[in-house]
From Swiss-Prot:
Substitution effect: residue 165 to R: No effect on catalytic activity
General function of this protein: Catalyzes the transfer of endogenously produced octanoic acid from octanoyl-acyl-carrier-protein onto the lipoyl domain of GcvH, an intermediate carrier during protein lipoylation. Is also able to catalyze the reverse reaction. Octanoyl-CoA can also act as a substrate although very poorly. Does not display lipoate protein ligase activity, despite its sequence similarity to LplA.
E.C. numbers: 2.3.1.181
Organism: Bacillus subtilis (strain 168)
Any Gene Ontology biological process: protein modification process
Protein name in the entry: Octanoyltransferase LipM
Amino acid sequence: MQKETWRFIDSGNASPAFNMALDEALLYWHSEKKIPPVIRFYGWNPATLSVGYFQNIKKEINFEAVHKYNLGFVRRPTGGRGVLHDQELTYSVIVSEEHPEMPATVTEAYRVISEGILQGFRNLGLDAYFAIPRTEKEKESLKNPRSSVCFDAPSWYELVVEGRKVAGSAQTRQKGVILQHGSILLDLDEDKLFDLFLYPSERVRERMQRNFKNKAVAINELIEKRVTMDEARKAFKEGFETGLNIHLEPYELSQEELDFVHHLAETKYASDEWNYKR
């Protein structure tokens, strides 16, 4: 059977506003049938704290720490909680809800898309699998997250290696198109991450950070020989091709497309109105 060809865009390191604008632009172009489905890899310059679309930043985010670490800040178009984008490979997948391989429900579509990430971890020699909540108590805990920190609890079909979460993802559906994006951690500075949030007390912070160590992990904590960003890109690009049974064709944005993205970045994702609205 012939493999379907999707576009592959590696946009390198870019500003937080540009990164979110390009994801939205790809969703829009795909909804207009101007482009096929897309897998995109990217990084962040500067390192950035992103928050979920619905997140209340006044109650949850420590902006003194965000400024102290010279971090970028952006609100995502997707839900979920706070993510520090630093030593990671970030990916996005843009595909129509009508695609024959895409299930109708969010969780099942997440599982299908994340098969590419699962294969990527396996390409690096890691034994990755999907965590599925087994008990009613586990299911309830997913509905009521205790923490502002995205990696603090495995969610439905979360990717896990040796019982600890290795890739956090979020999904939105607009204009009949699925946008899923997420973080693949190579390394993680836990103290910096936990500085970025507000807590009822120092004791609560200490307890959460202690629990976090048992739940979340970066690739280079699990592998003896350190994985470079280039090695990660290769492993996960091949992982998506295997996991989704597709062929990825590299694509460079045209100047016209770049102009569209820059305009969207400036007018929406770099604006206080968007970022500080909650």
